[in-house]
Regions:
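Intrinsically disordered, polybasic Lys/Arg-rich low-complexity tracts
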Residues: 636-757
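Conserved alpha/beta catalytic core and glycan-binding cleft of carbohydrate-active enzymes
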Residues: 308-310, 325-491, 498, 519-590, ...
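Short glycine-biased active-site loop of nucleotidyltransferases that positions the nucleotide triphosphate
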Residues: 74, 205-209, 253-260, 377-378, ...
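Substrate-binding/active-site clefts of carbohydrate-active enzymes
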Residues: 118, 138-151, 160-341
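Short, flexible loop/turn elements at secondary-structure junctions
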Residues: 51-53, 77, 88, 160-165, ...
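Carbohydrate-interacting/catalytic domains
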Residues: 1-152, 176-186, 454-457, 468-476, ...
Length: 757
């Protein structure tokens, strides 16, 4: 139900207030906050705020020399909602609420519903009129309504607005200027979406935006609200989607913010065992309180509707779901059923997703949820949380752990490559290589890779190729696409000077090529969440650290993916082939253009009639050391029954002509027979055991008998170390900064989210 925008009267049954107190005013920002309007022919601003425990509230600012009590508000519902109209106030005027607590103290608070705010270190709210912006993204909006959200391409470039690129000495671009710089780069690189770290107003740069004080105000660090509208509008016109991080899990204790808003808990849970994250130093919302539900759901819809944002990535969902999250014994209380689940938070998330996706089914609601909580991306009506995507933190942790391992020891960790297929299709996953993985001593992505300078690039290329082919949508944090060696810092721009070195430009070219290949081949995104879009060929060659699998699209087109996670050349590597014909190599991470050796290319490979891996035929290829290869699978041709009958008739006619000189014999009518081909029989045999069993074997490799192994694949070679680095690029491989950037408080591994504290 959409709240009205009619003139509000001092009546407790007023619709906006009634819906607000029921938890159902999902456009509360239209009523609360500061709004320019005309009363009795005089222009001014009406202020409204919710403060249930206050004994008095006044509006203060430059207009009254910040004098408490000079402009007192009055209750409009005889309960908790306060209002005041001040003639003569105008856009950009700064104000706060001076709240008198029940203890008699005065606290000065920023407006929770403010559309604009002062730039830190100042923290006052500003009057702002959102109306009047001319949008130009109608074509984008209409196209999005027809988009298949789940079965479409999604390749996200995650970025921090203030440190992607700066002008001058670390002076950030404003939102509109940033769009002009960003659009050509995103289009050239081929990403489909940009995801912004939080841009809701926040006081501390080192929190990266994850400690929010203004849930309705784009941070003024980068301009005005209309500047941010221009940012989104320009990206949409360029065909680029915009996702933003949204933080409903917790908020900071800054005295001007939501904390103890009227001297007592309003927005936070009043129970100290539920209302505070001591390790993070932040407060937890009271998810069961109706007014808080209206506040948060209004905030989410505000960004989607007023700023045309395409989706929200909901931060720290795991911390909302569990009462014992980051709490020791005695620091938490069980729920009414004796469990550790936060029942109110679960109900809130379901309500949030039902509301948003009910209004906008084409929007993205992405959960950053790091536990095994079931059915995160299933509808609330089926017992799920109602998101339509979830970050795959398990895949990320396993694969980064595997890639850090020296290739000599990867054989014993092969299950980390294959284990994700135990659960890959249980949720609608996004594969995230996010900002959290390149900060606080974890090292940049390329510095996680083992080996010398060239080996690091070869490992990273192999990993990117595997990631792009793995089922699930994709996300990569800025700077990793060209191999930044230093950890990310919010205090300075990316190390763009690295693109003056060949290895970095070649890696960037490789990522650009991968992104283009991804968009052009539906097999990589059309069936991401079903076994119908994926099939193992070689899951368990742990001794040689090789995997091979198929990705398929809805039309039956297939891409064969082969990954060699060892720096060893594999000549004569044989694997099963689903279709007979010629297999064309369409991407090779070891290509010279990408910084590889360029010594091995399979170009086109013919199948031979050697059954293997459950298929009637196989191919033999050469695997470059430390590489990912993509092959185009030939289209399977199926002749129609009529064609077969015609061929049979021609064959019979030839035989008859050849025997013409012999006495004619009575010819029997040809018998129609239907035989199951060997290929069909083999396929049936393979299907019988079930795909889940195949995934199980993949995740837990077993040693194959020596005879079978020799027949199936090329003999294993002892891994060799790669060549020593070239001296030319040594300056690019700079170490992480000696002086670490400011950072939020440390956090336990349960939710790998360093930035939330």
């Amino acid at each position: 139900m959409k709240p009205t925008e009619e003139k509000i009267h001092a009546d407790p049954s007023d619709l906006p207030i009634y819906l607000f107190k029921q938890g159902n005013n999902c456009e509360a920002y239209r009523y609360f906050g500061a709004h320019i309007e005309t009363r009795a022919g005089e222009s001014g601003v009406v202020f409204r705020v919710w403060a249930p425990h206050a004994t008095a509230i006044s509006v203060v600012g430059d207009f009254n020399s910040w004098k408490p009590g000079s402009h007192p508000m009055r209750k409009v519902d005889n309960d908790s909602v306060w209002e005041l109209f001040i003639p003569g106030m105008k856009e950009y005027d700064v104000y706060k609420y001076c709240v008198t607590t029940r203890a008699g103290d005065l606290v000065y608070k920023a407006d929770p519903y403010a559309f604009h705010a002062e730039t830190r270190p100042s923290n006052g709210s500003k009057v702002y009129d959102l109306s009047g912006f001319a949008w130009h993204d109608e074509a984008w909006q209409e196209a999005q309504k027809k988009t298949d959200v789940i079965n479409g391409p999604m390749n996200i470039y995650e970025m921090h607005a203030g440190s992607w690129k700066t002008k001058g000495e670390n002076v950030p671009y404003n939102y509109s200027e940033l769009a002009d710089q960003l659009i050509p780069y995103i289009k050239e690189m081929g990403y489909t979406h940009v995801e912004l770290l939080p841009v809701m107003e926040y006081p501390f740069d080192g929190s990266w935006g994850y400690q929010v004080t203004g849930y309705f105000a784009p941070t003024s660090r980068y301009g005005t609200p209309k500047d941010f509208m221009a940012f989104v509008d320009k990206l949409h016109e360029a065909g680029i989607g915009v996702i933003m991080d949204w933080v409903p899990a917790h908020f900071p204790k800054d005295q001007f913010g939501l904390y103890n808003f009227d001297g007592e808990p309003c927005y936070e849970d009043p129970n100290p065992k539920r209302g505070e994250h001591k390790e993070w130093g932040t407060m937890v919302f009271d998810f069961g309180r109706s007014e808080v539900q209206s506040f948060l759901i209004s905030s989410a819809l505000y960004w989607l509707e007023q700023y045309h944002i395409d989706g929200l990535r909901v931060d720290a969902v795991a911390s909302m779901l569990y009462l014992d999250y980051n709490r020791k014994q005695g620091e938490w209380e069980p729920n009414k059923d004796g469990g550790k689940e936060n029942l109110e938070a679960v109900a809130f998330l379901r309500k949030l997703n039902n509301t948003i996706l009910g209004r906008h089914p084409h929007k993205y609601m992405i959960a950053e949820e790091s536990t095994a909580w079931p059915m995160v991306t299933k509808p609330a009506s089926d017992g799920g949380l109602g998101f339509n995507f979830k970050w795959n933190m398990g895949w990320m942790n396993d694969m980064l752990s595997y890639m850090k391992t020296d290739p000599l020891f990867r054989a014993g960790n092969h299950n980390k490559v294959t284990f994700s297929f135990f659960y890959a299709f249980s949720e609608n996953f996004v594969l995230p290589i996010s900002h959290d993985e390149v900060v606080h001593g974890k090292g940049s992505l390329i510095n996680k890779m083992p080996g010398d300078y060239e080996a690091k690039f070869a490992n990273l290329r192999t990993f990117f190729g595997y990631m792009m082919a793995h089922p699930g949508k994709k996300l990569l944090f800025m700077g990793q696409e060209f191999g930044q060696f230093t950890e990310w810092s919010e205090e300075k721009q990316l190390d763009w000077m690295l693109l003056g070195y060949d290895k970095h430009t070649e890696l960037q070219t490789y990522v650009k090529t991968l992104n283009a290949f991804y968009k052009e081949h539906p097999a990589f995104w059309q069936i991401d969440y079903s076994w119908e879009g994926f099939q193992w060929i070689v899951p368990d060659d742990f001794q040689q650290s090789v995997v091979a699998f198929l990705r398929k699209d809805a039309a039956g087109k297939q891409i064969l993916v082969v990954c060699n996670f060892n720096p060893v050349l594999r000549e004569g590597y044989t694997l099963g082939a689903p279709v007979s014909g010629t297999y064309k190599e369409v991407l090779n991470s070891d290509d010279e253009a990408f910084g590889g050796s360029g010594t091995v290319h399979n170009k086109s490979v013919r199948t031979h009639k050697k059954p293997l891996h459950g298929f009637e035929q196989s191919i033999t290829i050469t695997l470059p050391p430390m590489s990912t290869l993509y092959f185009e699978v030939p289209t399977k041709r199926t002749r129609k029954a009529a064609d077969k009958a015609e061929t049979a008739e021609k064959t019979t006619a030839k035989k008859t002509a050849a025997k013409a000189e012999k006495p004619a014999k009575a010819e029997k009518a040809p018998k129609k027979t239907t035989r199951t081909t060997k290929a069909k029989a083999a396929a049936a045999a393979e299907e019988a055991p079930g795909k889940a069993e195949k995934a199980k074997k993949a995740a837990k490799p077993k040693k194959a008998p020596a005879k079978a192994k020799a027949e199936a694949e090329a003999p294993a070679e002892k891994p060799k170390r790669t060549r020593k680095p070239k001296a030319e690029a040594a300056p690019a491989a700079e170490a992480a900064p000696e002086k670490p950037a400011r950072k939020p408080r440390a956090k336990k591994a349960a939710e790998p989210k360093a930035s939330e504290k």
